[in-house]
Amino acid sequence: MRRRGPEKEEEACGVWLDAAALKRRKTQTQLIKSSTKMLTLLPGERKAKISFTQRSCPSAGTRQTSIASFLTSQQGKTNGADQRSVSSHTESQTNKESKEDATQLEHLTQGLRADFMAPPLATSTPADIQEARLSPQSLKASCQHGIGTPYLTVPCLFRPDTSVCAGASKASLACSFAHDLESSCLLDQKEGEDSSCEREWLQGSKKNNYQSVERHSKTTGHKGHQLLDKTNLENVSAKRSRQAPVLQTYKDSRRGANMKAVKQSSCPIPGFSWDSERNDKDSWSQLFTEDSQGQRVIAHNSRAPFRDVTNDQNQGYGRVPNSLWAQCQDRTTQFNLQPDSLFTQDSEGNQVIRHQA
């Protein structure tokens, strides 16, 4: 037997956790990154380097119904949140960029005030505007109507100091909304007029074709009927008088042939008969009977009387119904065999098959 050595001491844990240090809250050292998606800008514009913070719950009492209301309600709020999170260096840069962009926008608005062709932006949300501007179809449509007007609202979201943007964006939004309503109404009117014109043209063409066919048939048929009425009537009456006896004999011959074919091909159709039902009842009565308790059981008709059977092995083999016994007798007579040579009785009186040694 080996001696057990001294038990090893438990290794001390080298990591000690300070509960007081864990309870302290970590101070935020990094700036919060902007979670709002920036809208697409013009190629000449610069992207603002301002990080916006997303508010968890909207301010009470304000409901966004259009882009203009969104701009006016969010101008003062974004200024306070941005000035707290952005350093003084970034503020100076953004002020310079905002002034440059304001001068550029003034030139753009002066040249594009006459063209108020813009896509519908009055009833859409910023996410819808972003999706619409990112799609190539909307870009094509905006380029065709006028470059610059749909993008006038973009710097207003990120540079609220410029007062020109708000006025220009409101005017462009109102005009674009009115113009879109007018264009939609005009399109509906044009579609209705086109559909009505097509229907009228189809109806007119059908009527013209029908009238031309009627005129042609009247002009050609009227003259022909006047000339050929008498001759046609005489020819038709003569043909009918000639064909009448031939058709009558043909019909009589067809009727006789059909009757003969039906008589020859008529075979007994299996149908319901009361005799068959009676035969079925008789066969069922031969196969089944009632016991002392009135229950329906299989009838065992054997030569020997019923006895108390103790040998269960020979119980199912000896008793054969009369119908089956008759069939067996017929088969044995066909093969010139006697029934006594096939079956015998055991000590208990049951009919069993004879086994010759």
Curated annotation (Swiss-Prot):
Location of region: Interaction with AURKA: 189-357
GO molecular function terms attached to this record: damaged DNA binding
GO cellular component, one term: cytoplasm
Subcellular location: Nucleus; Chromosome; Cytoplasm, Cytoskeleton, Microtubule organizing center, Centrosome; Cytoplasm, Cytoskeleton, Spindle pole
Composition-biased stretches (Polar residues): 72-93
Pfam families: AIB
Source domain of life: Eukaryota
GO biological process per UniProt: double-strand break repair via homologous recombination; negative regulation of double-strand break repair via nonhomologous end joining; spindle organization
Family the entry assigns: Belongs to the AUNIP family.
Known role: DNA-binding protein that accumulates at DNA double-strand breaks (DSBs) following DNA damage and promotes DNA resection and homologous recombination. Serves as a sensor of DNA damage: binds DNA with a strong preference for DNA substrates that mimic structures generated at stalled replication forks, and anchors RBBP8/CtIP to DSB sites to promote DNA end resection and ensuing homologous recombination repair. Inhibits non-homologous end joining (NHEJ). Required for the dynamic movement of AURKA at the centrosomes and spindle apparatus during the cell cycle.
Entry protein name: Aurora kinase A- and ninein-interacting protein
